[in-house]
Regions:
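Residue-level recognition of pore/gate-forming positions within transmembrane alpha-helices
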Residues: 34-38, 93-96
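C-terminal membrane module of polytopic membrane proteins
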Residues: 93-150
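Functionally important transmembrane alpha-helices
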Residues: 53-117
């Protein structure tokens, strides 16, 4: 939903990412913000309110954390590059729509589908990791002096 996306992005990319960029490298920014953003969702996964009940909780946590940290890397890059939280809000919203309303519904389901679809499966996490690696490399080069500004 728009209010929850906006709330998350104001907190994670609007406040946390710029503050972290004052004290650590781009690598530090993406690791800390990505893991914290993932951990923010973990209670809902543990309680069974968010996730995929067909796979183990450990599988869900691993791939969700990998996906969110990777996606957070891309969003931190665009946030710092544009100096605007709105780019992260738009990315987050588009990502949610694609995953929840397009990718998962059009996937042919079988007994193994739960292991590869949506935010809790392997496919999106692995694809996001490959894309995030490219953004991480760009970020390391472009924002090499982040923590040195203060």
């Amino acid at each position: 939903s728009i209010p929850s996306i906006l709330g998350e992005e104001i907190g994670w990319r609007g406040l946390l990412v710029p503050e972290l960029s004052k004290i650590t490298s781009f690598t530090g920014v993406v690791l800390v913000s990505g893991i914290l953003w993932s951990a923010f969702h973990w209670p809902l996964i543990f309680l069974g309110l968010y996730g995929n009940s067909d796979t183990s909780i450990y599988y869900q946590l691993f791939f969700f954390t990998l996906f969110i940290t990777s996606t957070g890397t891309i969003m931190a890059y665009i946030r710092l590059k544009t100096d605007s939280v709105w780019t992260a809000v738009m990315y987050h919203g588009a990502s949610n729509i694609f995953i929840q309303k397009v990718f998962t519904p059009i996937t042919i389901t079988n007994e193994n589908s739960s292991y590869y679809i949506d935010e809790f499966g392997a496919v999106l996490a692995l694809v996001a990791t490959v894309v995030a690696f490219a953004y991480w490399r760009k970020g390391v080069k472009e924002f090499s002096s982040l923590a040195q500004k203060t």
